[in-house]
């Protein structure tokens, strides 16, 4: 007996899992790491809770030029940008701005550009 449904033997693959993984990583980074960074750099150091010598120019440059520091700075800039541009892309669709592939390319190109600039600027240190 033949089944009453068709199975597509060559389904069209979606690129959405790639964008969703960057979206998820950016959202997680923005929710967990960014508030701590803002707390330390924007509140605790200016209030004197953390000694300002801990963030002297020489120490910050040595951190930024280390592999862990460089990856931290790149992730701090790039991952939230991928998250934001994914939200912009899907937000435009929700607001009935159907830009199609051009809108998708524009949104993800901006995120890619910011990511590339973060890497370039880190290597310029």
From Swiss-Prot:
Its main location: membrane. GO terms for biological process: fumarate metabolic process. InterPro entries: Fumarate_red_D (IPR003418), SQR/QFR_C/D (IPR034804). GO terms for cellular component: fumarate reductase complex; plasma membrane. The chain crosses the membrane at residues 30-50, 60-80, 105-125. Pfam families: Fumarate_red_D (PF02313). Disulfide bonds: none annotated. One of its GO terms (molecular function) is succinate dehydrogenase activity. Keywords: Cell inner membrane, Cell membrane, Membrane, Transmembrane, Transmembrane helix. Part of an enzyme complex containing four subunits: a flavoprotein (FrdA), an iron-sulfur protein (FrdB), and two hydrophobic anchor proteins (FrdC and FrdD). HAMAP family: Fumarate_red_D (MF_00709). NCBIfam families: PRK05470.1-1. Belongs to the FrdD family. Anchors the catalytic components of the fumarate reductase complex to the cell membrane, binds quinones. This is Fumarate reductase subunit D.
